[in-house]
Amino acid sequence: MKYVVQFRPRAAKQLKALPKGVRRTIVQVIDALAENPRPSGAVPLKGTEFMRVRVRDYRVVYEVRDNVLLVLVVRIGHRRDIYRGL
């Protein structure tokens, strides 16, 4: 079953601010989450309901809602500051 991918407004803004090459790669990874929301590289974040995947030096933090087949992208950013405030 294919999941629907949605972005929080903050995540959409963060994606638009990334360099074009990185943005293209991240979009491909996010599109793949619709088919498999828990790929082999995905890691659950401790103390939250979120998961994350790595894309070069960037991270995509997202939530999977299995009951409604939804992948909600929460944040996208560089690894040095993506986890602040989660």
Q: Where do the protein language model's features map onto the residues?
A:
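Enriched for short, Lys/Arg-rich terminal
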Residues: M1-V5, R10-R24, S40, V55, ...
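A short, surface-exposed loop/turn module that caps and links secondary-structure elements
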Residues: V29-R54
